[in-house]
From Swiss-Prot:
GO terms for molecular function: 1-deoxy-D-xylulose-5-phosphate synthase activity; magnesium ion binding; thiamine pyrophosphate binding. The keyword DNA damage does not apply. Mg(2+) binds at D151, N180. One of its GO terms (biological process) is glyceraldehyde-3-phosphate metabolic process. The gene is dxs. The lineage of its organism: Bacteria, Pseudomonadati, Pseudomonadota, Alphaproteobacteria, Hyphomicrobiales. Its cofactor is Mg(2+); thiamine diphosphate. It comes from Rhizobium johnstonii (strain DSM 114642 / LMG 32736 / 3841) (Rhizobium leguminosarum bv. viciae). This is 1-deoxy-D-xylulose-5-phosphate synthase. PROSITE patterns: TRANSKETOLASE_1.
């Protein structure tokens, strides 16, 4: 076990109240120690490294200037919250990040009073902060609200909706735009620091308010002329004309790694008590750790790593990942069909569409963190005869549900939806679990909904989606590696709405939707050994259901169990509805539906989550035995 870093100053800081006792001159050393602590912790657990390293000075400055937790501090997404957790009473648990029963990798209300609003999905902080700021006004409270949002999250429409509303309400809200894209070089020198202090001070704001009153008195024409001159003059020096026109005081850009810049600006904004204010802070992802500075993209989310070399631990996979199988199959099909295009919402690497972009750069589009736009953009392409693959994580597809319904499904447009990270995702917990896509897509008329049982099936589904022009079609697959099956040279076109029998039996039928098929086959071995002859079927489709297959299973078995890594209301619910409507439950057929439990399951390894849910080999066997009134035989499902 490597030795913990020496952190004499950080050892004095348990909560922000302790931090506020330090002198300004001590803060650079504190920042170095927080970085050392964070690097050591994440090297042991894995997690999001680069974003947190980039906001160490900013986080310290905010907690130094503002009276948290009475003043509310909200982080957008939360990838950058690790320094915040270290400084807010959670340092003793920081090496449990993203582990079972450990600290969340995001802010969580249930975890600390210093986390006033939970985060994990993008672009929510300004809206939540505005709600809190208005609540403070209604309470006649002087508490401040600070929302920290990254430049990536500012690409989503929700952020601008909130900015527009905050400006119209003249809310006492402080928005800090953390610009770590390195598209703007951090300003340096005394003059830029002076201008930022001047722009945030009472004198400038008072003069600006006086100017507004004067121009209003003089009339609309002079108002427009003077306002335009003032705003463009400020925009020329410090930027921010757009934010000013939304009603925000704009300050910056300022160096987010300089306490000489951060502290006076934050103190001015705190003491002015006005709003809304937007402070543009420029930071560097991975700041203070050379490997992360040199390759920010590779150190955004990391496995466990060696602190000295930066080398990340890599487990040699037994099979290709589902994401890579999807990507390779799509590139293969795109080589043969120039109507195929790919769309991602700021996740080209995560979804595998970076491979399509490399092969066909003009046919792959990263639209930023804008899932709603991504789906309707895909609908427009489909309306013109193209074959768009809108590749999204299951949890992020939720953000675009109205567009899926209104712009795609109602119009019957053949948009293809590869749904990655379906089911349990492990360390990111309930905010990123792919729980609901089957349930919310199967409610839509005319939607084809598939799930891959293994990596070969995924390849078939890519080709099936390419060939299908009858309306929208989706196929889901999990995070991680496949099961190691033989791979076809090219996928086959599946018959829509038809499943398959994988193993024949006579007494119990296990009907799987998705990758739980492997556990169903293992469970069938145990059930056969216990004298319960078991059929295993792969549904392939949740919509349209394979009615013939379901009838066959119901009529020739004493018991049918549906198994899926999804929520209540999905595949199993549709099977149950069909069986009830057909009267196939009237003669005593035992039916059970295994799904993800109706709770928000906390972070753990996916295999542990499936075991807890009863979706693994042992859980399936146990369900059968309980339904039949039998105890689990010794040695079965061991």
């Amino acid at each position: 076990m490597t030795q913990l870093p020496k952190t004499p100053l950080l050892d004095q800081v348990i909560y922000p109240a302790d931090l506020r006792k330090l002198e300004d001159r001590d803060l650079p050393q504190l920042a170095r120690e927080v970085r050392d602590e964070m690097i050591d912790a994440v090297s042991r657990t894995g997690g999001h490294l680069g974003a947190g390293l980039g906001v160490v000075e900013l986080t310290i400055a905010i907690h130094s200037v503002f009276d948290t937790p009475d003043d509310r501090l909200i982080f957008d997404v939360g990838h950058q919250c690790y320094p915040h957790k270290i400084l807010t009473g959670r340092r003793d648990r920081i090496r449990t990040l993203r582990q079972e029963d450990g600290l969340s990798g995001f802010t969580r209300r249930a975890e600390s009073e210093y986390d006033p609003f939970g985060a994990a999905h993008s672009s929510t902080s300004i809206s939540a902060g505005l709600g809190m700021a208005i609540a403070a006004d209604l309470d006649k409270s002087d508490r401040r609200v600070i929302a920290v949002i990254g430049d990536g999250a500012m690409s989503a429409g929700m952020a601008y909706e909130a900015l527009n509303n905050a400006g119209a309400l003249d809310a006492r809200l402080i928005v800090i735009l953390n610009d770590n894209d390195m598209s703007i070089a951090p300003p340096t020198g005394a003059m830029s620091a002076y201008l930022a202090r001047l722009a945030s001070g009472r004198t400038y704001m008072g003069f600006r308010d006086f100017g507004k009153k004067l121009t209003a008195y003089l009339g609309k024409n002079i108002d427009r002329a003077i306002t335009r001159a003032v705003e463009h003059a400020r925009g020329y020096v410090t930027g921010g004309t757009m934010f000013e026109e939304m009603g925000f005081y704009h300050i910056g850009p300022i160096d987010g790694h300089s306490f000489d810049h951060l502290l006076p600006v934050l103190r001015n904004v705190r003491d002015n008590g006005r709003g809304p204010v937007l402070i543009h802070v420029v930071t560097q992802k991975g700041k203070g750790y050379p490997p992360a500075e040199a390759a920010a993209d590779k150190y955004h989310g990391v496995n466990k790593f060696d602190v000295i070399t930066g080398a990340q631990a890599r487990v040699k996979p037994n099979a290709p990942s589902y994401t890579s199988v999807f990507a390779e199959a799509l590139v293969q099909e795109a080589t043969l069909d120039d109507k195929i295009v790919g769309i991602t919402a700021a996740m080209p690497n995560g979804t595998g569409l970076d491979k399509l972009a490399e092969a066909f750069p003009s046919r792959c589009f990263d639209v930023g963190i804008a899932e709603q736009h991504a789906v309707t953009f895909a609908a427009g392409l489909a309306a013109e005869g193209y074959k768009p693959f809108a590749a999204l994580y299951s949890t992020f597809l939720q953000r675009a549900y109205d567009q899926v319904v209104h712009d795609v499904a109602i119009q019957g447009l053949p948009v293809r939806f590869p749904i990655d990270r379906a089911g349990f995702v492990g360390a990111d917990g309930p905010t990123h679990a792919g729980s609901f896509d089957t349930a919310f897509l199967t409610t839509l008329p005319g939607f084809v909904v598939m799930a891959a049982a293994d990596e070969a099936e995924l390849k078939h589904m890519v080709r099936t989606a390419v060939a299908y022009d009858g309306g929208p079609i989706s196929f889901r697959y999990p995070r991680g590696e496949g099961v190691g099956v033989d791979m076809p040279a090219r996928g086959e076109i599946l018959q829509i709405g038809k499943g398959r029998i994988v193993k024949e039996g006579t007494k119990v039928a296990l009907l799987s939707f998705g990758t739980r098929l492997a556990d169903c086959l293992l469970a069938a071995e145990d059930l056969d050994a216990a004298g319960l002859s078991t059929t295993v079927a792969d549904a392939r489709f949740a919509k349209p259901l394979d009615h013939d297959l379901i009838r066959q299973l119901a009529r020739h078995h004493e018991m049918v169990i549906t198994v899926e890594e999804g929520s209540i209301g999905g595949f199993g619910s549709h099977v149950m509805h069909f069986l009830a409507t057909e009267g196939l439950l009237d003669n005593g057929l035992k039916l059970r539906s295994l799904v993800m439990p109706d709770i928000w399951m906390e972070q753990a390894k996916p295999e542990a989550m499936n075991a807890h849910a009863g979706l693994d080999r042992a859980g399936i066997v146990s369900t059968v035995f309980k339904a039949l009134g039998r105890g689990v035989a010794v040695g079965v499902a061991g």
